[in-house]
C-alpha cells in the first residue's frame, strides 16, 4: 500500500492520519519519521522499508480502504542509532516533530524540522570522529565542468572549474571524497551517473534545474556571504563553479530548515594544485581504507592526532597531496622546529584535552547545539592559553612562520570562557528540555522561578500544619498527583468538619479531596513556574547561541588553527617515533630515496624491515624489477609511492634521505581481480587500467606497474609488457617502476633510460631465503618452485613440478640451438630512423599471415573495451588457423 495512492481522498482517515499524509506528500523521496509521543512512527511503504533495513517489527495502525495500514516505529530516545543506519544505507530521512501544544482539539501541530541525508550530517551520533560529510555538486555545460564541495559539519566550502574530460571525473571526485553528489536533473548525461556509481559508493541526488541556474547563482552566493560582488573570491569568470556552489546552498538550507551562518567564505581550488590520484591508485596504496578487512591503511597507521578535527584534516591531507613546494617546506619547517626542541609532546598533551569544537560550532550555527556542546567549547577556550604556552618556545624562535601564524589565529577567548562558565552548569543534562542547564546566579528571573519550584515542599508542610490547627483535624493531609493537582485530603468521617472555604475536588471510596483558594493560588504559581523556568532556560540558551554565532568567524579560525597544529604535531610525533627524515624538493625530474621503508609493513612486521634505495631521473626513467614472488617487489614499489605521497603532504618520510622532483600524478597497476559486476575478466581489468596509464601519464608522473600481461598467454603477455615498457620510456617519459616475471624484458636494460633491478634471494640446503634487498641487474632465476614450497604446496606436487620444469628447460635449450635468437624479438616499425627507433618487439609472424592482415585493419583509437577483447580473440583464432 502506497501513501501517494490514497492521498486523493483523506476524508476516510483519522485526523492524525490526514495530518501524516499531508506532510508525507511534500517528502515522497524521504523516510518520514513522524513523532508520536515517545516514538517516531513510519507508515505505508516507509514502514516496510524501515522494517527491512532496521530489522524492526512491522505491525499496523488503523485501516485505509479497508486494509490495515502498515506501521513501524522506534523509540525517540534511541532514534539516533536507527537514523545513522538509514543514512549509512544512503537513505534520506525527514524528521517530523510535535511543535504545538496539546489542546485536546484535534492532533497536535507537527512539522518537518530537519532532513538527514548522507551529505548533510552534523551530529556526532550520525558520524564517526574521523568521517567527513562532504556534499558535492556538479554542473556541466558544453566542455566545462564546475565542482563545489560543502562540509556542513566543518564549515568548509570550496569550488573549482575546469575543462570537462569524462575520464578525469573519477579522479577529481575521489579527491573530494563525497558522501553525496548533487546533479542537475535536466542536463546530466546518464553515463555520468553510471561512471560515478562505478567508482564511488555514495548516493547521487537529482535536483531541480532552477537550483543550478547560472543567472541566479551570483545572487544566492552574494546573499550567503553578505557581499555585493564575488570578485574578492575569484569566482567572476567561473559560472559553472558558482552554479554548483549555489545548488549546495539551496540544498543545505532545505535540509537544515535554517540559515547557514557558519558558511562565510568560499575557497577556489585548481586541480593542478594537487597530485592526481585515481580511485584505483588510492585503493592499491591503501591510503585511507585497507584492501582487506583486517588490514591497516596508511591513515590508520599515521593517525595519532589528539583531536577529531585534526584526524579529519589529516585524512583530507593524505587524499590530496599538494604540489606547492613553498607550502610543503613551511609545514616541514614547523615539524622540524617541534622535533628539535622536543616541543611536540607538551603541545599534544594540551590538544588531547580539546573536544571536537569544529562540529560543535557547526551545530551552534545551525541551532542544533546541545548543552554539552557548549561545555566542550568552554573547555576548549580554557585550553587555548596552555596551548599557546606550549608553542611559545617555537614561536619566539621565529623559525617557523606557519606556527607563528597559527599561534595568532588561536586568539584569546578568555572573556567567552568566563561567560560560558557563568552561564552553564558544570555538568548539564544531555537535552535542554530536561532543565537545570543554566547556572544559578546567571539570570534573576530564572532564579526566582526555580525558588518557587524548589521550595514548594516546605510551603506544603507549613500549610498542612496551619490547616490542621485551623480545622482541629490531626489526620488532614496535603498531597499532589498529576490528575488532580494539589489537594487537601480528609477521611469520610471527617469530611463533615470541612470548613466552608474547602471546595470539593475529588471523591474517593474512603476519603474526600478539597482545594482552597490559597492552595489553588499556590498550585497555579508552582505549576506555571516549572514550565516558565524551562521556557526561560530555552530563551537564555538561544541567546547564548546567538552570541556565539556573532563570533563564529573567530571561533572557526581558532578551530582550524587547532586542527592544523594537531596534524603538524602528529607528523612530528611520527617522525621522532619511527626515525623518519625530512624530504627535499628539487625542480629537476627524479626521485632519489636512500634507505626507504614501507611505513605500514615496517610497523606491522615482527622482523627488522630491509630498507632499499630508489633512483629515477631523466636518464634513468624506467626500472624493470625481477625476482621471486614474496621477494618484496610490490612492497618496494608501494613504499616509493607512499614516501612520495607523504613528502607531498608535508610530512617527514620513512627513509634515511629523500629528494623528489615535480610529480603531477601517481598511477598504479597492481594486483589482479575479476570485475564481475561489469563482466570483465582479470585480464580485461588489467588492460583497462593499463590503458588509463598509457593515455594519461605524463613526463612528471610516477607509475607503478606490477606483472602486466600475466592474465593472458605467455607470448601475448610478454609482448604487451614489452610494448608498455617501450611506450612509457620513449613516448610518455614518465618515472616508472615495472615489476615482472618475464625475464625476457631484462634485455631492454641495454636501452637508454631503462635499468634492471632485482630482489635478492638465496637457496640454502634446498630452501629459499628471501632477502628483500633490491639491487641493480636482472634476477638470475625466478625461484617459483621454492616460493610454492614456502607457501605449503605438498611435497609430491613440488616434486612433480621439478620434473616437468627439467623437461621444459631441456626443450627450451634444444629450441634455442635450432633457432636464430635475434629473430625472437623483431622491430615493430622498420621505417623509423635509428635515432628515434622505438624498441617495441613482438613475436615474429609471416608477412602474409591472416593475423597480420587483421591487425592492420584495426582502428585502435575507435575500439571500445568489449570490441578490443573481441578483436584479441579474432587475432588469436587467426594465428591458430
UniProtKB/Swiss-Prot annotation:
Gene Ontology MF annotations: ATP binding; ATP-dependent DNA damage sensor activity; damaged DNA binding; mismatched DNA binding
GO CC entries: cytosol
Binding site for ATP: 627-634
Signal peptide location: none
One Gene Ontology biological process: mismatch repair
Disulfide bridges in this chain: none
Cross-referenced SMART domains: MUTSac, MUTSd
Gene3D superfamilies: 1.10.1420.10, 6.10.140.430, DNA repair protein MutS, domain I, MutS, connector domain, P-loop containing nucleotide triphosphate hydrolases
Keyword annotations: ATP-binding, DNA damage, DNA repair, DNA-binding, Nucleotide-binding
PANTHER family: DNA MISMATCH REPAIR PROTEIN MSH1, MITOCHONDRIAL (PTHR11361:SF34), DNA MISMATCH REPAIR PROTEIN MUTS FAMILY MEMBER (PTHR11361)
Role, per record: This protein is involved in the repair of mismatches in DNA. It is possible that it carries out the mismatch recognition step. This protein has a weak ATPase activity.
Similarity remark: Belongs to the DNA mismatch repair MutS family.
Protein name: DNA mismatch repair protein MutS
